[in-house]
Amino acid sequence: FMNVMKKDHAVFLDVPDFDLSRLVHADKLGIEIVDDMRPVKLGKLSVLHGHEYRFSISNPVNPARGLFMRAKVSVMCSHFHQTSQHSESDLDGKVVSAWSLGCLCDLHPRYMPLNKWNIGFAKVETDNEGRFEVSNYRIVDGRIYA
């Protein structure tokens, strides 16, 4: 958001109340705006935008597999705008999973009209011990699919 504003609407940046946190009343809603390149934790699940690894996430299978190969922990990202999931168990049977999320934006913007994007979102539930359950949804023709 702020990158677009700096580029296309710089005149607004000098207005004191023109800040994403203030515009959406994040403090009143208990929302923390994460505007830097740092992982966020939802229990034991790491959440990234996905660009933190720069161009080093290759995804010959799907974005979640590429993310899994880099992170080596249970992780979720949204940078690729594609719904995917990848899981593997280690020698001790511990399951590690990665998810990439669809997007809630224009699927064919001018800067990238040909892509593999899809509409989607995720819901994450956590418990007091940090365990988590990810529901990764895809929206097709206005219907939500798990």
Task: Indicate residue ranges for each PLM-predicted region.
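Short acidic loop-to-beta-strand element that houses the catalytic metal-binding Asp/Glu
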Residues: 36-41
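Short, solvent-exposed aromatic-acidic interface loops
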Residues: 135-146
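Active-site glycine-rich loop that binds ribose-phosphate moieties when present
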Residues: 24-35, 54-64
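Active-site neighborhood of divalent metal-dependent phosphoester bond hydrolases
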Residues: 1-34
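Conserved beta-sheet core of the metallophosphoesterase superfamily
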Residues: 42-137
